[in-house]
A protein has these predicted regions:
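Beta->alpha loop/short-helix hinge microenvironment recognizer with preference
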Residues: 1-397
Length: 397
């Protein structure tokens, strides 16, 4: 069912003027996301005409854009992803671990998203794998599913990694399953200290290699010594790693993952109103507790669009990654070995999948089955290719 107010409504109303005033300062990925969201489930993308087999009622269903930043398209994507991951789940407790960048480092990431977000993944995963392998702690190889979120509840820039980690791993010799303590995976203070060291060491290496760029008020950080001075106080700060107690079972893990894997900066459900005053939406202020945490905010439409687009990821950037036992190269063999050590039956990944349920909602008049009776062509036209200028000295025909 369509929400009363959608991000698409705001984009369609204010998007053209917003793009015009910022021509040359909006990335191609951001422009593509805006266009996809504006045309999603409209005649522009085409669709089909459905008819009820019983009463003859007809309705039009338009196609989805399937853009990963579209608030309307994430439900189906999440269901498909979770179905593929179900075979990897083990009958053990799972922990939720969060790695967050300090505000000073988030500012660096703002203009270097692909490079710094990639470093965030690498430093956080290496931290977990290194300390888990230490015999003084777990002494095992663990599996990690990591998801990048770049936003706070008010759509501010707040990069952090959510990890789902089984409570244990395969011993370093591969001969037994090593379980973690029931409510304790790894020491978070040690995780925070190693994460800080790995991240800052490699961030400095990236700067030395010329892979970081700074503009405007931060342009002074292009200088090597100025950048090193900027990092000095950050090295002394405590970097917080948060770990939640384990889930009650694999089903709870899937339910929890579904809330994190395919989120976007703001869902349509959080939008309250859109008028000349701006866009009003619900958010959570995590500095408060209880009922005081739930608040509303009103932003000018231009600022709302700017904040939303801050979280459009660079083209081709993978926001869900797997490490350790769940890394793609050895995932199947590692999961099979873990199941063997845990003495649980293997899942048959080659078995024929269950017949998919009909994705079309039933007839709103009689509850009958709706079938496609006509395909509707898209009305959206791509921009014409640029006209080529003839070489100097030639006259265009």
């Amino acid at each position: 069912m369509r929400q009363a107010l959608e991000v698409a409504d705001i984009f369609r109303c204010h998007g053209p003027a917003w793009r015009a005033t910022r021509a040359g300062h909006v990335s191609l990925a951001q422009l593509k996301a805006m266009s996809a969201i504006e045309t999603c489930r409209t005649a522009a993308l085409g669709g089909h005409l459905e008819g009820c087999e019983d009463c003859g009622h007809r309705r039009i269903a338009y196609n989805s854009c399937r853009n990963r930043h579209c608030p309307k398209c994430q439900g189906a994507a999440a269901r498909e992803w979770l179905a593929a991951r179900e075979a990897d789940l083990l009958p053990v407790g799972y922990f939720h671990v969060v790695f967050t960048l300090p505000a000073e480092v988030a500012d660096i990431a703002f203009h270097n998203k692909a490079v710094v977000y990639d470093l965030l993944f690498k430093a956080a995963s290496e931290t977990m794998l290194t300390i888990a392998a230490d015999p003084r702690h777990l002494g095992a190889r663990i599996g990690i599913t990591a998801v990048l979120h770049t936003w706070g509840s008010a759509m501010t820039h707040h990069p952090h990694i959510h990890m789902i980690v089984p409570g244990g791993g395969i011993s370093l010799d591969g001969e037994r399953w090593v379980s973690s303590r029931p409510a304790f995976l790894l020491p978070v203070r040690l995780l925070g200290a190693l994460f800080r060291r790995l991240f800052l060491t490699r961030l400095l290496e990236l700067h030395t290699a010329g892979r970081l760029q700074f503009f405007g008020d931060q342009s002074g950080l292009n200088d090597q010594r100025a950048f090193a001075r900027h990092l000095a106080p950050i090295r002394k700060k405590k970097w917080v790693v948060f770990a939640k107690p384990p889930f009650s079972g694999p089903e709870a893990v899937l339910a929890y993952l579904s809330r994190y894997t395919h989120r976007v900066a703001i869902s349509n459900r959080r939008l309250i109103s859109f008028d000349e005053a701006g866009v009003t939406f619900r958010y959570k202020d995590y500095r408060c507790s209880g009922a005081d945490r739930h608040r509303t905010m009103t932003l000018h439409a231009d600022e709302f669009i700017r904040r939303f687009l801050v979280h459009v990821l660079p083209q081709g950037f993978h926001r869900i990654r797997h490490y350790g036992l769940l890394a793609s190269a050895g995932r199947k063999a590692n999961v099979a070995r873990a199941r063997e050590l845990l003495a649980v039956p293997m899942t048959d990944e080659t078995a024929a999948p269950d017949a998919p349920s009909d994705p079309r909602p039933p007839c709103p008049c009689c509850g009958g089955r709706m079938v496609v009776i006509e395909t509707l062509k898209p009305t959206f036209r791509a921009r014409a290719p640029p006209r080529l200028r003839p070489p100097a000295g030639m006259v265009a025909s």
